[in-house]
Regions:
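Catalytic center-proximal scaffold of phosphoryl-transfer enzymes
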Residues: 1-169
């Protein structure tokens, strides 16, 4: 919830908390929680499978008052569907960029299966010339199905229609 909205909610209840004070609290909280966030990502990288995705996150550019696009990278480990007993873990990383350098830095040292949506930035991890040749990319079934469905809906491929029929639940 944006701080300006929190400030308004508190004000309705006659609690005056300045937005700049809340921003300072958020900064301090982020600093204090950083070791926990690093631990979560380290545990995720110990798994055989990691699911990754990135999403846009509008943020205010300091001093300009205008929004810019930043990215929230998400990394998930959940071995329960594969017989694992550990709890699911999620880690987030904030970046100003969607470049492959971000995911390479976040998952440095990871070896295993990386399930992603097909965005080219992830290819960097699977290329042997990038130093992370122990990563095997796995496509997201939903994203793959969408491509077949688009061909099926356009009526341009019998094979795509057959594939969609086989993928249907």
């Amino acid at each position: 919830l944006p701080l300006y909205r929190q400030e308004a909610i508190y004000a309705r209840d006659q609690v005056e908390i300045d937005r700049s004070q809340m921003a300072q609290w958020m900064g301090k909280l982020g600093f204090e929680l950083e070791p926990l966030a690093d631990y979560a990502l380290a545990r995720i990288k110990q798994g055989e499978r990691v699911f990754a995705d990135e999403t846009t996150l509008p943020t205010l550019a300091p001093g300009s008052g205008k929004a810019k696009t930043a990215y929230l990278w998400t990394y998930v480990r959940d071995d329960r569907p594969f017989g694992g007993s550990g709890p699911p873990i999620v880690a987030y990383r904030f970046e100003d960029s969607r470049a492959g350098e971000c995911v390479a830095r976040h998952l440095d040292g990871y070896r295993g299966i990386l399930q992603v949506d097909g965005y080219a930035a992830y290819n960097r991890l699977a290329r042997s010339d990038r130093g992370n040749d122990g990563v095997m990319l796995a496509a997201c079934w939903s994203h793959v199905r969408r491509k077949f469905y688009e061909l099926h809906a356009a009526g341009s491929s019998v094979i795509a229609s057959q594939t969609v029929a086989q993928m249907a639940p």
